[in-house]
A protein has these predicted regions:
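Single conserved hydrophobic/aromatic residue that forms the stacking wall/gate
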Residues: 1-12
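Mixed-charge interfacial surface used for oligomerization/domain docking
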Residues: 10-168
Length: 168
């Protein structure tokens, strides 16, 4: 179970399930298709702060403090085991947004559905949306504000990017 990606990934899974039900698929077909689809939804994140992750034991407090002092943003993904995998560290928002677009390319995104969820950072979410649409012709991008547990971990300035790869 990829618990880290539950919020954004579940949105696409619910939509996909609704589509399958509307098509009149049988229960066994739906189960098989949902298991297949689950493998093709992914989550990337950009965090401006690691403080709450440190408080909950996901990163060491010294690492969180050092990142804050140096203005480092962490770009990562949800692993298959539900852990946070750090892909890279960048300085500044623009570098983080560029890196997200590069990671999308590397992880098989072509032009499917992509959802950007921001935590008090609508300007960065809009910039990322425009960057994605410029690179991936026909991309279906929507934006919302983080809520609940996602906003706690993303913290102010954080972005979560849920997307379907080319095989979805």
């Amino acid at each position: 179970d990829r618990s880290v990606s539950r919020g954004l990934g579940d949105v696409y899974k619910r939509q996909h399930l609704r589509d399958l039900l509307a098509e009149g698929k049988e229960f066994d077909e739906i189960c098989e298709e949902m298991l297949r689809y689950h493998k093709h939804t992914h989550l990337l994140f950009s965090l401006e702060s690691l403080a709450n992750l440190a408080r909950n034991g996901r990163v060491k407090p010294a690492v969180a403090a050092m990142a804050r002092m140096l203005g480092i943003r962490v770009i990562g993904q949800a692993s298959e085991a539900g852990e946070l995998d750090v892909l890279c560290k960048t300085r500044g928002e623009h570098g983080a947004l560029e890196r997200i677009v590069l990671e999308l390319k590397e992880h098989g995104y072509t032009n499917g559905r992509l959802h950007i969820s921001h935590c008090g950072n609508p300007a960065a979410a809009e910039r990322l949306k425009h960057m994605v649409k410029a690179v991936f012709d026909g991309a279906k991008v929507d934006i919302s504000e983080c809520g609940g547990l996602c906003s706690y971990y993303a913290e102010l300035g954080g972005l979560l990017v849920g997307y379907e790869d080319a095989e979805a």
